[in-house]
Amino acid sequence: MQALEWKDGLFYRDGSPALMISGEFHYFRVPKGDWRDRLRKWKAAGGNTVATYIPWLIHEPAEGEYSFGEHDYDDLEGFLRTCLEEGVQVVVRPGPYQYSELRYSGLPGWLCEGYPQLLARRLDGSVFGKSSISYMHPLFLEKAEKWIRKVCGLLAPWCAGRGGPIVAVQLDNEAVGIHTWFNDGWYDYNPDTFGFGNPDGRWPRFLREKYGTAEALSEAWECRVDSFADAAPLCQKAESRGGIRRLRDYEQCYLAQVSDYFALLRSWMTESGLDLPYIHNSPNPDANGDFFEIADRMGPRFLLGSDHYYNLNQNWKQNNPTPQYAVRNFISLETLRNLGVPPTVLEMPSGSASDWPPILPEDARAAYETRL
C-alpha cells in the first residue's frame, strides 16, 4: 500500500486519480471475531479505507499502565494485521482527543479527574467541561507526549511505507469544538496557558508582537491599556470597533496556540516513526476558516477536511437535510478547494444513536448528494 497522496485537488493511488471511500470502524467496539467479516462486507459495498480512533482512555486505563492486546477490544495490532490481510487502507486517529461519544471525550479519567488544573476555563476562571482540556497547558503536554510517543511507536511498523495498511494519521479531533461547544461559543481562557497578567505570557507576548507599544494597543482597542500584562481579553458581544478588534485579537491568539499544539503533535508523531501525511477534521462545515494558519504552517503533506452532520439529536436546527444545509456544505467544500486540497468530508452520518429523529434512506441520499 501507498501513503495517501493528493495534488491539484484530487487523491491519487498508484499514480492515477482515485477516491478514498472510508468508513469509520472502531475495533474497540466491534467483537474481534467479526472484524474480518465486517471488512469484507465494507469492501463489497465499495469501500477501500477504514478510519479508527485509538482511544487513550482504553489503552492507558491507569496512568503509566498501557494495554495493547491484553484484551480482544484493545488488540490494535491485531486489527491492523487484519486490515492488511484484507487489503483495506487505514487512517488512524490517535488523539490525544477522540470524542466519538466516549467518556471524557476519549481522554483517560485519571487525567481529567486527577489534574483539574489542565481543564479549560472561562474568563472568570470557572470550568465549563469535565473533559475540555487546555491544549497548551504545560502539564497536559507532558502527559500527552508520553501517550503519543507510546502509541505512535507501536503504529510505526504498520505505516504504508513499511508495507503496512496505515496511509494517514489524524492530529487530534475537531479542534476548537471542545471549547466553543461547551463555553457558549467562547474559547479557552486558562490563565496558565495564556499567561494573563504575566509580561512573558502567551497573550501579552501576542499583543506585544502585534502592536509594539501599549499606546498603539490602546488606540486600536479604543480604551486605555497601561501595559500588555494588564490587557484583558473581551468575552462578550462587542459594541464598538475597538471591542471588535479586541475580540479578534484573542481569537487570533487562541488559534495561534492551536497551531502550536498541532506542530507539537506532528513533531512527536514524526519523531516516533510515522512517515505519513497528516490530516485534521474541522468540527463543522463553517469552521474551515479557523484552520487556514494551521494548514499553511503544516505544509503540503497536511490535509484539512470537514465534518458534515445534519442531525445528531432532537435539538438540532433541522431533522432532515435542507437547502440551507446544502449551501453550508457547498461553501465548506469550496473553501477546501481554495486551500488546494481535495474537498474531503472526514465525518458524515450514516446512522444515529437516537431513535428519533430517524435517519431514513431518502435523507441519507439527499445528504450524501450535497457533497457531489
Task: Mark where each language-model region is.
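N-terminal carbohydrate-binding accessory modules
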Residues: M1-T49
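Alpha-helical scaffolding within the catalytic cores
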Residues: L4-G9, G33-R38, V151, D286-A295, ...
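Hydrophobic faces of well-ordered beta-strands that scaffold small-molecule active sites
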Residues: L19-G23, V50-T52, V90-P94, V167-L171, ...
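Short, acidic/polar
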Residues: F28-A44, D286-R297, A364-R371
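Aromatic-lined substrate-binding rim segments of carbohydrate-active enzymes
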Residues: W35-Y115, A156, L265-S272
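Acidic (Asp/Glu)-rich catalytic clusters
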Residues: L39-G46, L84-E85, C159, I294-G299, ...
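Polysaccharide-binding and catalytic clefts of secreted carbohydrate-active enzymes
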Residues: C112-R301, A326
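Catalytic-core region of carbohydrate-active enzymes that cleave or remodel glycosidic bonds
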Residues: A263-Y278, F292-L372
